[in-house]
Each structure stands twice: as C-alpha cells, then as structure tokens.
Regions:
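Conserved beta-strand/loop scaffold segments within soluble protein domains that form the structured core
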Residues: 1-114, 125-132
Length: 132
C-alpha cells in the first residue's frame, strides 16, 4: 500500500514543484495520492504525478486527486496527472481541479461580521481540512 497526502499553503512568490511516481508491479496493490494547495499573491505550484500499472498488477486500486484553490488572480497552477495502465482488471481514477474563492461563501462569512482577511483564512483552512 502507498499513501501520499500533501497540503501546501503558498503565499507571496513561493514556488513549489511536486513530483511523484508510483509503480504497481504486483497483483492487488493499492495507492492513494491526495494533494491539496492554496495559492495567494504570485505563488506557483507545479504538480506532476504518474501512476504506472504493469500488466501483472491485476486487481490494483489506484486513486490520484489534486485540488487547488487560487486566492488571487496572479497565482498559477500547472497540474499533470498521468496514468499508464497496462492491464484491464483494475480500478484506477484521477481528478484535478483548480478553483477560485466562492464569492457566496465569502459573502456569507462577511455578512456575519468577519472581515475579508479572516474570511479568506477560514475558507483556506476549510479547503485544506484544517478545521473540523
């Protein structure tokens, strides 16, 4: 089993390059990659993850997720999920998203008397699952 979890908070002119490769060689193997990031100011994230499933790796379960929240128009994200699947008897999925701040959520917090800075911080922490 392979689990990769990452949470990145990028601000100012931070640059982060995330790269991983998971190679499934035997039957019944499992992997789950879950990477989230928030980006502000002129920060940049590059995410590249490759999952390789050999022909002999039947009954493999491989999941790949990358979610990114842009908190400014000048922040940038490049996300490249790659699946190299060489057998049919598997369960694999991937998904990548890049989204902006939900203005309705921001407005709802501000209507409760929370200033813009704190409202954005709350949304960022909720996105990263830092608040329960």
């Amino acid at each position: 089993h392979t689990l990769v979890n990452g949470k990145y908070i990028l601000e100012e002119d931070n640059i982060n390059n995330v790269a991983c490769q998971i190679h499934h060689k035997g039957p019944g193997s499992y992997s789950n990659v879950d990477v989230k990031s928030t980006l502000e100011d002129k920060s940049h994230l590059s995410f590249l993850c490759e999952i390789i499933v050999d022909k002999s790796a039947i009954d493999t379960d491989a999941q790949l997720t990358n979610k990114n929240l842009q908190l400014s128009k000048t922040a940038t994200v490049v996300t490249e999920p790659q699946l190299d699947i060489n057998t049919k008897e598997i369960s694999c999925s991937h998904g990548c998203t890049v989204s902006n701040v939900d203005k309705e959520q921001l407005y709802a917090l501000q209507s409760k008397g929370i200033n813009d800075t704190d409202a954005r911080r709350i949304l960022k922490e909720c996105f990263l699952d830092l608040i329960i």
